[in-house]
């Protein structure tokens, strides 16, 4: 497997709709000149943005977190330009970008250093071959302080690895349960 470059990412996004909406370069400022946490195409990856809808874990309903029987009451919904994650807590968001992963590509997501240096960890499972949708992002605030996530700004980087041969069975072939997700998607059993 080889990591794919900015040229490949641009080609796949512009010619095959792999990423929509798509920024062909790095965006660091708004049109008004305000600094943002960068997003868009980088040398060997694509920095994604998160949307304005967040789900923050809460214990006000005394729910137990069970991935096989998930209770939506475990979350408080927040909509806005920022999300404040309580100390040592967790939130979900989604990418503004919609992805269509090619059959011979596996995509890995890593957090951006700007957030990592603040104790905010981004976790995303791999985007498997032929998966498509908006990515659900998992943010962990590992600090004893509240942490701020900025919507419409860079939060994580996607790395694309192309195999020398296509897989026998893709995510689409097996009817993966998160295919086509749009917005924050909770665990499905």
From Swiss-Prot:
Catalytic activity entry: dCTP + H2O + H(+) = dUTP + NH4(+)
Disulfide bonds: none
Gene3D superfamilies in UniProt: 2.70.40.10
Residues reported to bind dCTP: 112-117, 136-138, 157, 171, 181
Record key words, sorted: Hydrolase, Nucleotide metabolism, Nucleotide-binding
Pathway: Pyrimidine metabolism; dUMP biosynthesis; dUMP from dCTP (dUTP route): step 1/2
Keyword DNA damage: no
Active site: 138
E.C. code: 3.5.4.13
Presence of keyword Nucleotide-binding: yes
Pfam family, one: DCD
GO biological process: dUMP biosynthetic process; dUTP biosynthetic process; nucleobase-containing small molecule interconversion
Family annotation (InterPro entries): dCTP_deaminase (IPR011962), dUTPase-like_sf (IPR036157), dUTPase_trimeric (IPR033704)
Catalytic class of the enzyme: hydrolase
Sequence similarity: Belongs to the dCTP deaminase family.
Subunit structure: Homotrimer.
Summary of the function given for this chain in its UniProt record: Catalyzes the deamination of dCTP to dUTP.
Protein known as: dCTP deaminase
Source organism (scientific name): Halorhodospira halophila (strain DSM 244 / SL1)
């Amino acid at each position: 497997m080889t990591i794919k470059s900015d040229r490949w990412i641009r080609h796949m996004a512009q010619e095959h709709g792999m990423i929509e909406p798509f920024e062909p370069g790095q965006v660091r400022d708004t049109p008004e000149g305000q600094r943002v946490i960068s997003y868009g195409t980088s040398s060997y990856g694509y920095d994604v943005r998160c949307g304005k809808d967040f789900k923050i874990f809460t214990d006000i309903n005394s729910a137990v977190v069970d991935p096989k029987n998930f209770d939506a009451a475990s979350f408080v919904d927040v909509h806005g330009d920022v999300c404040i994650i309580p100390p040592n807590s967790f939130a979900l968001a989604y990418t503004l970008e919609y992805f269509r992963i090619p059959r011979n590509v596996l995509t890995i997501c890593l957090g951006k250093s700007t957030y990592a240096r603040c104790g905010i960890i981004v976790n995303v499972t791999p985007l498997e071959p032929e998966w498509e949708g908006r990515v659900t992002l998992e943010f962990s605030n590992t600090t004893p302080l509240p942490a701020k996530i900025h919507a419409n700004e860079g939060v994580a980087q996607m790395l694309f690895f192309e195999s020398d041969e296509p897989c026998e069975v893709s995510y689409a072939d097996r009817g993966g349960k998160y295919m086509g997700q749009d917005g924050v998607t909770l665990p499905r059993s």
